């Protein structure tokens, strides 16, 4: 698991501005943008209201979110999934990322409802680049 920094009051204010809502279930800051603001938050696998939440690494940096949204809108997930089917080394690396994601989430808590489910389509397809970029950062 990457180093997770504690959340400050300034972080919460920045996250509210980034998200347009109050952040939920934040465990800490997993990545900071160049300006020092949160870029990726680590989120509890169970939200305060009891809802299971498989997205451990939630991308919040507005510039990165916008860039990833542009790439997603171009439909690259289909091509990326095709590459996973054709390239055994790439598929093995993607499976390893899936396992690492599950291990990171397990370190934050065990939630039976989402056991074995990572995020972003892992390990067999590419579904949500926001999750994958958040994990990579």
Where are these predicted regions, by residue range?
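Preference for intrinsically disordered or flexible, low-complexity segments
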Residues: 1-137
């Amino acid at each position: 698991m990457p180093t997770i920094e504690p959340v400050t009051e300034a972080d919460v204010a920045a996250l509210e501005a980034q998200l347009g809502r109050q952040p939920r279930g934040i465990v800490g800051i997993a990545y900071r943008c160049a300006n020092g603001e949160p870029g990726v938050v680590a989120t509890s696998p169970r939200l305060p209201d009891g809802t299971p939440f498989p997205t451990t690494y939630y991308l919040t940096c507005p510039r990165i979110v916008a860039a990833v949204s542009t790439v997603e809108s171009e439909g690259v997930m289909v091509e990326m999934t095709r590459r996973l089917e054709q390239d055994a080394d790439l598929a093995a690396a993607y499976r390893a990322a899936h396992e690492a994601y599950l291990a990171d989430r397990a370190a934050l808590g065990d939630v039976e409802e989402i056991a074995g489910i990572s995020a972003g389509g892992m390990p067999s397809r590419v579904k949500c680049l926001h999750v994958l970029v958040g994990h990579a950062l």
